UniProtKB/Swiss-Prot annotation:
Keyword Transport found: no
SMART domains reported for this sequence: HOX, POU
Protein name listed in UniProt: POU domain protein 2, isoform A
Any single GO CC term annotated in Swiss-Prot or TrEMBL for this entry: nucleus
Location of the POU-specific domain: 286-360
Modified residues (Phosphoserine): S72, S211, S215, S217, S219
InterPro entries: HD, Homeobox_CS, Homeodomain-like_sf, Lambda_DNA-bd_dom_sf, POU, POU_dom, POU_domain_TF
Gene Ontology biological process terms from the UniProt entry: central nervous system development; ectoderm development; generation of neurons; neuroblast development; regulation of DNA-templated transcription; regulation of transcription by RNA polymerase II
Stretches with biased composition (Low complexity): 1-30, 207-222, 252-270
Lineage of origin: Eukaryota, Metazoa, Ecdysozoa, Arthropoda, Hexapoda
GO molecular function: DNA binding; DNA-binding transcription activator activity, RNA polymerase II-specific; DNA-binding transcription factor activity, RNA polymerase II-specific; RNA polymerase II cis-regulatory region sequence-specific DNA binding
CDD domains: homeodomain (cd00086)
Principal cellular location given in the protein's record: nucleus
Length: 498
């Protein structure tokens, strides 16, 4: 046991000597350090050695001073701090472990001290009570400052480059005008700001408790009736412009331009004009006419006109001679195709309906003769040209097999003689005039396709099948094969007359 104590004391002595050597090296490196610091380090080392001697199980050494007897190990450790390195034994390690476990649950107070908080609060109060006022200059002061800057600038330019300003008065005038303009703008801006401060905009917001809740269906959105929704887009524009029976194309501006057009239209000023406008609206046929009814009438009118054998130009000419309203073929065509505005179609409908009734009654009186122009003209007018003008011949529909036979005959001879046309008409059971017109139309079509071909030669030379895209075997087919087979009617039709 004594041996262990001696070994421990020897180790402590070695540690003390090493600390002394460290302090000596620090003193040699730091020449400017004071002697008091050196003494303090030596005393600390001595105290450390004496403290460890007192904590040992052996009786206290007589070298320990009486002043240190009343101090515990913790107090001496707090006094020394981190000034020197001290050897650790088992007891110091155990105490350090206990201190660490206590510091685990300790909360650090990182808040600033109350004194600094009070100073910051005082500074904030002073800043809020006396905010920094912006520097405000009167217009006269600004004008004087601008003039001073102007004069100094001119003097500086004269000194640096006198040849740059041969006439300094002009430069002075120019700069003075610019400064005056800037001053006027600044004054106007200040006046606007003052007015905004004096007259704030009134707020029209309604409290939430009093504002009624409105659904999207109840919102004040302009709505149209069913008849207006089914109206073509050109009708609203035509109504707003008050147009007459002029032709309205599909490219007519739609409802998007209606507000602008209404603004440009002069409004009625007197009560009489308003009353007359209301009377015209009441008498217009748009209220009693529906779009579906118009569509149905246009379809029926076209069918009846074709059945009676009259062209659109005939109808327009007859309406001009009978009722005093001249209409072109384009207007009748657009009416049948529903390409007119709703208002114009409503105006045209009664006139066309009247013409159709007159034409039907005339045909019925004549005993069902469709092309009896004399009967119709004697009933409706004195001259034949006053009602229908020209008459239109029937259109002939050609079957697919017949058209194929005609195409092959055209390849063999593009310009047949009258005898060949008669033979074809007998073989195909068709009218001779129809076959002649078909060959004429086919030659015109071939000219459009191949302008270089000479189809007007007096002799009907056979054409090459390769020029028209037909196989060579098509020219060697028999008449039985050409006539054999049943085909369906197709939509191709030719006109036997003008």
């Amino acid at each position: 046991m004594m041996v262990l104590q001696q070994q421990q004391q020897q180790r402590l002595w070695d540690a003390t000597t090493t600390s002394n050597t460290n302090t000596q090296t620090q003193q040699s490196a730091n020449v400017e350090s004071t002697p008091t610091k050196v003494c303090h380090q030596e005393n600390a080392a001595t105290h450390t050695f004496m403290r460890h001697m007192s904590n040992s199980p052996t009786p206290p050494s007589p070298l320990r001073s009486l002043s240190d007897c009343g101090k515990s190990f913790e107090e001496e450790e707090l006094e020394l701090g981190e000034n020197c390195e001290m050897p650790q034994n088992l007891s110091s390690k155990r105490q350090a472990r206990e201190l660490d476990s206590e510091l685990e649950n300790e909360v650090l107070d990182l808040a600033p001290p109350p004194k600094r908080l009070a100073e910051e609060q005082e500074e904030e109060k002073v800043a809020s009570v006396n905010p920094p006022q912006p520097v405000a200059f009167a217009p006269e002061e600004m004008h004087q400052a601008l003039q001073l800057q102007l004069h100094s600038y001119i003097e500086m330019v004269r000194q640096l480059a006198p040849e740059a300003f041969p006439n300094p008065n002009l430069a002075t005038q120019f700069l003075l005008q610019n400064s005056l303009q800037a001053l006027a703008q600044f004054q106007a801006l200040q006046q606007m700001k003052q007015q905004q401060r004096e007259d704030p905009l009134p707020s029209y917001s309604t409290p939430l408790a009093k504002s009624p809740l409105r659904s999207p269906s109840l919102s004040p959105v302009p709505r149209h009736s069913k008849s207006q929704q089914r109206t073509p887009p050109n009708s609203m524009t035509a109504n707003s412009l008050g147009m007459s029976s002029a032709v309205m194309t599909p490219n007519t501006p739609s409802m998007q331009q209606q507000p602008q057009l209404q603004q440009s239209t002069p409004k009625p000023t007197s009560g009489l004009t308003v009353a007359s406008a209301m009377a015209k609206l009441e008498q217009s046929p748009e209220e009693t006419t529906d779009l579906e009814e118009l569509e149905q009438f246009a379809k029926t009118f076209k069918q009846r006109r074709i059945k009676l054998g009259f062209t659109q130009g005939d109808v327009g000419l007859a309406m001009g001679k009978l009722y005093g309203n001249d209409f072109s073929q384009t207007t009748i065509s657009r009416f049948e195709a529903l390409n007119l505005s709703f208002k114009n179609m409503c105006k045209l409908k009664p006139l066309l309906q009247k013409w159709l009734e007159d034409a039907d009654s005339t045909v019925a009186k004549s005993g069902g003769g469709v092309f009896n122009i004399n009967t119709m003209t004697s009933t409706l007018s004195s001259t034949p040209e006053s009602i229908l003008g020209r008459r239109r011949k029937k259109r002939t529909s050609i079957e697919t097999t017949v058209r194929t036979t005609l195409e092959k005959a055209f390849l063999m001879n593009c310009k047949p003689t009258s005898e060949e046309i008669s033979q074809l008409s007998e073989r195909l059971n068709m009218d001779k005039e129809v076959i002649r017109v078909w060959f004429c139309n086919r030659r015109q079509k071939e000219k459009r396709i191949n302008p270089s071909l000479d189809l007007d030669s007096p002799t009907g030379t056979p054409l090459s099948s390769h020029a028209f895209g037909y196989p060579p075997q098509a020219l060697n087919m028999s008449h039985m094969q050409m006539e054999g087979g049943s085909g369906s009617f197709c939509g191709s039709s030719i006109s036997s007359g003008e």
